[in-house]
Amino acid sequence: MHVSTLLVAVLLPLALSKPTPRKKTSSFKVHLARRGETEYYRDGPTDLQRAYAKYGIPTTHEMEGYHPQPISKLPGNSKATAGSGKEGVESQDEKGEVVNNPTDHDIQFLSPVTIGGQPFIMNFDTGSSDTWVMNTQMTDEEAKKDHHLYDPSKSKTASKLVDQNFDIKYGDKTHASGPVYSDVMDIGGATVRNQAIGLPSKVAASLAEDKTSDGLVGLAMTKLNTIRPVKQKTFFENLAEDLDEPVFTAQLRHGKMGSYEFGAIDKSKYHGDLIKVPVINENGFWEIPCSLYSVGKLDKIQTIQNGTGTAILDTGTTLLVLDEKIVKAYYAQVPGARYDPTRFAGWVYPCNSPMPSLFLAVGTDHMAIIPSSLLTFQSYGPGPDGVETCYGGLQSNNAGGIQILGDVFFKALFVVFDQRGPSISLAPHA
């Protein structure tokens, strides 16, 4: 098979609410400052367990015995803060942009959001369609600690949506549920006046323990929205008709500041040409064909055999979660790699082992390279044998029938989400 090297750096082609009317003449870049003097992180097995829960993937017997680690304090300097929302504001034009901040190990890319004039740091999630925020009406006082809390009584623009409730479940254990309010929501200068926002009266402990984030902005399709009895549009869907282009882009880079941008595609943020891929949106996800892979070399392209054939682009998931066939083929090329069913309930390897790159199909005509440098999630230090152990950024979907292109994928590629079609487009980061 002849393979062009036109985009060899990362992409390789193979043979219901109303948004605020806005002028399309200005935008704002919002730089993050610090969020206090504490910093938090998750561990790899916990993130994998949460990914399984989010998509209802059955856990392994070993994972059922693995207890998610509480969010732990670490020394360091990659901290996020919710300030006034105006710090470091830089006026530009014809687009709305918000700069995100990676937390430890790039587990989340967090961004400043203003709701009813109140500032928060939130996680943008292209794998769900509900927007919800920690708030003063939560019944669990412990869950409120160390979060910025939305108070509808302090907003002049808030109104409760009568008899409307949301209940988003990420598997059996992780959830958020409660009443729904409408309020003005601003992200990087892009504003929706009557955005539906869930105010959970209770949240799962794993969500409350994540002190880096005050909530979630869902950016998948309305079909996934859990508000009842009437589904509500996402922030992006409300905003799209007032944008120059109905798009938003994700620039999530390893260990660096990145950005989400609404209404325009900044050509300075990527190399080469964008590769456009139609989205399979029947399930409400940003889902694309993904049925080919190769480990290390493009001359050994293999077809995924178990019939999954698609993958979901999800900024709310940390890891790359793929069919077990791919994962086993990858780690077969990593000296000392093994599936550890006890301590890690996932794939680990000596940190000094050479790692191959991973090639994945994006659509039917192109392959994306995930560089080896992005495929280590974190180190756990020396094991009993004195060898430093690393947890892989690539993990198995446990035959769950769903493949998830999480932040490991986004760190390799600049991604455009386009409502027209819909479609996604990809290119190497600049």
From Swiss-Prot:
Positions of the propeptide removed during maturation: 18-87
GO cellular component terms attached to this protein's record: extracellular region
Stretch list, region Disordered: 61-104
Superkingdom assignment: Eukaryota
Pfam families: Asp (PF00026)
Keyword annotations: Aspartyl protease, Glycoprotein, Hydrolase, Protease, Secreted, Signal, Virulence, Zymogen
One GO BP annotation of this record: proteolysis
Residues forming the catalytic site: D125, D314
Annotated EC: 3.4.23.-
Residues the record marks as carrying a glycan: N306
CDD domains: Aspergillopepsin_like
PANTHER family: ASPARTIC ENDOPEPTIDASE, PUTATIVE (AFU_ORTHOLOGUE AFUA_2G15950)-RELATED, BETA-SITE APP-CLEAVING ENZYME, ISOFORM A-RELATED
Protein name: Probable aspartic-type endopeptidase TRV_06366
Organism, as annotated: Trichophyton verrucosum (strain HKI 0517)
The organism's taxonomic lineage, starting at the top: Eukaryota, Fungi, Dikarya, Ascomycota, Pezizomycotina
